[in-house]
Amino acid sequence: MAVQRTLLVVKPDGVERGLIGEVVSRVERKGLKIVAMKMMRLTREKAEEFYSVHRDKPFFGELVEFITSGPVVAMVVEGDEAVSVVRLMIGSTDGRKAAPGTIRGDFSLDIMKNIVHASDSPESFEREFRVLFSESEIVEW
């Protein structure tokens, strides 16, 4: 097994609904480590950079509007196969199709307001991490 890092972001709808603790608890109960975490409000520029892979998609503008509509909580999660483990933990992007027991399956009925974002690959993590964090914010433990 390979120890990896991945990014997990509680989106504005998750923050507004008071689900930060729920998300953190699920990460910890799974045996993963949070090595960086902060609350922030993304600027339009940061949001566009963060979601740059979707720039040419029809939903890009709506996605940027939503992610900048309120605070988010971003965390770097570390553990064995962290990218795939966290993706399984959060469930399908479309909350209506996400399995019960997953974060989105338990708390979302929407494809946009789906509580959380998580990196979909180690390469995505590297790009997304550079937008939201610096290496000095990682706490080794």
Curated annotation (Swiss-Prot):
It is found in: Cytoplasm. The keyword Electron transport does not apply. The keyword Nucleotide-binding applies. ATP binds at residues 11, 59, 87, 93, 104, 114. Pfam families: NDK. Major role in the synthesis of nucleoside triphosphates other than ATP. The ATP gamma phosphate is transferred to the NDP beta phosphate via a ping-pong mechanism, using a phosphorylated active-site intermediate. This is Nucleoside diphosphate kinase. It comes from Aeropyrum pernix (strain ATCC 700893 / DSM 11879 / JCM 9820 / NBRC 100138 / K1).
